[in-house]
């Protein structure tokens, strides 16, 4: 197993607070591997990589990492952080459709919106010759629904082991989307756990609308 020698670079982070939040989430709380860890030799898909902290954390264990990030300004930092490891960087945003969209990332030190490429999941698989994924991490501001849906679910159930994602539920529309996803798709998996951002189990709270309204972001861990 190749050891990571380069220090993680926070170049292009919006500010110190943003860097601190990402560092705490990925490195200190171990949020994305809290329930299901990445295993030696896994093929990993990192959706919404930002500066690449999760990719950097697991790239010495994975046999291959596909790192997806829509903001072109962040790509050089991701390249620097992952140099020498089996990481393919894809400059795009996961979406229901292929095309372009105006996009702004609040983790970047430039608030000007930019046009970014959008790519659907099946195109992502085809363009990168992906035939299986052991572990998917997703934090892509609603792109989770472009991943887990009726079109993609059959492939996912045959070819993916675990999915870990951050869902946003702070707004009314987000809560409606989440409840539909919760009731239709989550029961189709072998197991799932739901945690608050600070790593407290809230699986059954999320079936109570009163409790749901108290959360803005949640983490879902899925055993496919």
Show where each model-derived region lies.
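Phosphate/nucleotide-binding beta-alpha loop and adjacent structural elements of enzyme active sites
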Residues: 1-224
């Amino acid at each position: 197993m190749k050891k990571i020698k380069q220090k993680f670079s926070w170049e292009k982070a919006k500010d110190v607070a943003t860097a601190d939040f990402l560092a705490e989430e990925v490195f200190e709380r171990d949020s994305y591997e809290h329930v299901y860890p990445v295993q030696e030799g896994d093929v990993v898909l990192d959706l919404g990589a930002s500066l690449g902290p999760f990719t950097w954390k697991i790239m010495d264990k994975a046999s291959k990492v596909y790192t997806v990030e829509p903001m072109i300004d962040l790509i050089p930092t991701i390249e620097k952080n992952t140099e020498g490891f089996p990481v393919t960087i894809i400059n795009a945003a996961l979406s229901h459709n292929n095309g372009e969209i105006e996009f702004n990332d609040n983790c970047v030190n430039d608030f000007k919106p930019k046009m970014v490429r959008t790519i659907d999941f099946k195109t992502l698989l085809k363009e990168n010759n992906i035939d299986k994924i052991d572990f998917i991490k997703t934090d892509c501001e609603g792109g989770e629904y472009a991943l887990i849906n009726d079109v993609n679910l059959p492939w996912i159930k045959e070819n993916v082991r675990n999915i870990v994602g951050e869902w946003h539920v702070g707004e009314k529309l987000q809560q409606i989307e989440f409840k539909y996803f919760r009731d239709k798709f989550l029961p189709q998996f072998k197991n799932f756990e739901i945690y608050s951002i600070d790593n407290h189990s809230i699986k059954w709270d999320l079936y109570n609308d009163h409790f749901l309204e108290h959360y803005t972001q949640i983490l879902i861990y899925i055993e496919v």
